[in-house]
Amino acid sequence: EFDTVYHEHLSFFNINSMEKACLMNDMVLTNVTKTDIHGTSYVFDIALFKHETDANIDDLKDCENSLYDINTYDEYSLNCIKYRNELHNALIEQKLSGKKLIGFGSTAKSNTLLNSMNISSDFFTCIIDENKLKQGKYTPGTDILVCSLDDISQEDVQDSIFVILAWNFYEEIKNKLKERFDNCIVMNIYPLFIE
């Protein structure tokens, strides 16, 4: 999920760092819950007094041990490059088959991803975003027009594929598009599939 590594998202508290922060402030970490937000995030339960800690903390900490091994980051880098190339090839394949690409979600993560692939404005017809402040503007670095869903007609959809760049909202966006447009084709970028 290299597309979520940018400016304010570069910092992430893992369990070890949260435990240290708690100790420095006379608190104790009592439980950790994993959530699916942005791939995976943690929700920490913290107490002011000594409490029993949940057994899952040790299990999750064991999973974090690889974070202190440089090979983990080398492998991560190779996986990012591999994924980026697979996605880029899938987009090129759609273009070569005659499909127009319409993106959905002009987010920081989508712009990080598109810039990493050197995508330009001739690749996408536009990128839909529901934020009115973004509509009529262009994506940074790639110069792709950001438009409203209302700018897309049923006729536009006939030879197009919607590329869901805001992959963490895939189901919601897909359902919205399928309700609005007959026979629309939707591509999820993470994981990569078309339906």
List the model feature ranges, each with a label:
Residues K20-L23, I46, I194-E195:
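Extracellular glycan-modifying ectodomains
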Residues M24-V28, Q94:
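A structural motif corresponding to the C-terminal end of an alpha-helix
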Residues M27-H38:
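Conserved S-adenosyl-L-methionine
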Residues E1-S11, I15-S17, C22:
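Short, glycine-/aromatic-enriched active-site segment of Class I SAM-dependent methyltransferases
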Residues L48-E195:
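Hydrophobic, well-ordered beta-alpha structural blocks that scaffold small-molecule cofactor pockets
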Residues G39-F44:
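Short hydrophobic/aromatic beta-strand or adjacent loop that forms the aromatic wall/cage
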